[in-house]
């Protein structure tokens, strides 16, 4: 092995050779285009390359390739470190949210696991269970991080799948076996196992879409919501009310879609929990409930009280979102007996890689601003009539968010809209409506692909996906009815409900114009 071969083996680790080569080519081309052709073209090239790294997140986590491209952009002068720092400081609350709120919810997983386990065992109707999962995921995602909600549901599904797989393989529950190996499955259990997989697939997808339905509603539902709220100067309640003319109709239609796909068994939905599996899981739940000590019950009670504090703290904006998250960490660890530094450290593992990636986003945003990359698009949109502007912003956001990361897309568009407001191109009232269009456009159509929704990508890359045969293509197919309904209802609400509803809410004094 030559030195160059050894270097390329190390470079970006286990990523495919073609992917490594593509990143190297990007790094070589960008300075040439910037210095000898056009900084504007080089800027767009960087944005396209960065979107490519996000779309290829399954090949390599975007932090490394995206970070290399961003560092090179700063070195060659597309932007500067001072501007990157300014972008980071302008969005510091989002960084606090990702660091502390996600970690805080980690210590409340026991309560969430308990709730979803009870739902699965107690509700026998598949339609009712699907709606309950979708609604619960939506409600939780309005206050908690969507990744955490999905992580909890994955934990429940993994636990139940593991239990049934062991029984179907003829093993005891305490046996350590490979649940990805189907070779020992008893012949008559094969069909039941396939039905159970289809059942779990549908539940996971309903819950995933639920996180999008709830996440769009509040400041803390998604990281990009807080970025938009910061620019528009909206607190928790005002953000909720501003979004409500769009998010409430979409939420109702989302639950209706959940009902219809289950009722008529469309797009891979409708499979019920086999009775044999339910009996095994029900017996296990009963055994676990009987084993629960008084100490365990007190832990659940404390976590429920902390959840109430979380909702009250956010609703009345008692502190910055990230600081409320820090208080959750302190309360949850203090009252459930978690005092070991290494155990506490595990809570931060989920959020810190994405927090680092977010800082790279801001570097690319700085390039977009310095090179005025979005000026032609924004000029085109803002030259349209005011009502058409809302639909165009919604559609452009939705299209880009379905293939790229929605935090990145929302940051770019809200910055451009704020610049238009500052320069007197649009009126304050129009900026407020555009902010709603950007938020809903970023959050709703992005359920189309795993690239658009972090929760979907997390589900796709989790260990449960291969077990229940949930591939990228199948996920896109199962999300299709939701994509169509959420996108169209969102667009219609933006066009026909939002302007009049905003004026009505302002007349009641529920929202305050800028």
UniProtKB/Swiss-Prot annotation:
It is a multi-pass membrane protein. InterPro entries: Na+/H+_antiporter_NhaB (IPR004671). It comes from the Bacteria. GO terms for molecular function: sodium:proton antiporter activity. GO terms for cellular component: plasma membrane. It catalyses: 2 Na(+)(in) + 3 H(+)(out) = 2 Na(+)(out) + 3 H(+)(in). The chain crosses the membrane at residues 21-41, 43-63, 88-108, 143-163, 203-223, 239-259, 304-324, 349-369, 390-410, 448-468, 484-504. The keyword Metal-binding does not apply. Disulfide bonds: none annotated. Keywords: Antiport, Cell inner membrane, Cell membrane, Ion transport, Membrane, Sodium, Sodium transport, Transmembrane, Transmembrane helix, Transport. Pfam families: NhaB. Na(+)/H(+) antiporter that extrudes sodium in exchange for external protons. Belongs to the NhaB Na(+)/H(+) (TC 2.A.34) antiporter family. This is Na(+)/H(+) antiporter NhaB.
